[in-house]
Regions:
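Short amphipathic alpha-helix that is part of the acyltransferase structural core
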Residues: 1-43, 47, 51-54, 61, ...
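Conserved GNAT acetyl-CoA-binding A-motif
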Residues: 112-126
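Short coil/turn motifs at secondary-structure junctions
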Residues: 70-72, 96, 128
Length: 167
């Protein structure tokens, strides 16, 4: 049986209500926040030009990432970037689709989007995700190598599409 997979990339202002609801449901199933909290967070934090990469398998949303276009102050050792960057905000693959290559497919799609925008991208991640991001072209930043200004975090940093050797 062949599995039909589709990657759909849309800006927030292109998402249908059904697509938004599917995103809320997927996020609520992954994190311990109710759908109502997901909706409120989405409305408060997501802007119309943010990018949503959805992995659809047999008409079901099984993977999702958000790339948020933000002007961000990111301090990398000596360099402070005060430019628009893509914050890689969310990465979810449903449990039953993990370790089957679908996550890699989704991240590679994201990497292409990031390269095509010619912007740098930054993410915060848990320890258990570092090797996954590294094998997909992201560079690990130790906590003393970066400072995300005006943001509370307690995670590892990863950076993509940053060619200068300032880190």
């Amino acid at each position: 049986m062949k599995i039909e997979t589709i990657n759909i990339l849309k800006r927030t202002d292109q998402l249908s209500e059904t697509e938004k609801n599917n995103i809320y449901l997927l996020k609520a199933s992954h994190w311990s926040y109710e759908i109502k909290s997901q909706i409120e967070w989405f409305k408060k934090n997501i802007i119309s030009s943010d990018l949503h990469n959805m992995l659809i398998i047999d008409n079901n949303l099984v993977g999702y990432t958000a790339l948020r276009k933000k002007k961000c102050r990111l301090k990398l050792k000596k360099l402070i970037s005060n430019e628009k960057i893509l914050i890689f905000d969310t990465y979810i693959i449903k449990d039953e689709f993990r370790k089957k290559g679908f996550g890699t497919k989704l991240i590679k799609s994201n990497n292409k989007v990031i390269r095509d925008t010619n912007l740098m991208s930054f993410l915060l991640c848990d320890e258990n995700m570092i090797n996954f991001y590294k094998k997909n072209g992201w560079k690990f930043l130790k906590s003393d190598q970066f400072q995300l200004i005006n943001h509370k975090y307690n995670s590892n940093g990863m950076i993509f599409n940053f060619e200068k050797d300032n880190t």
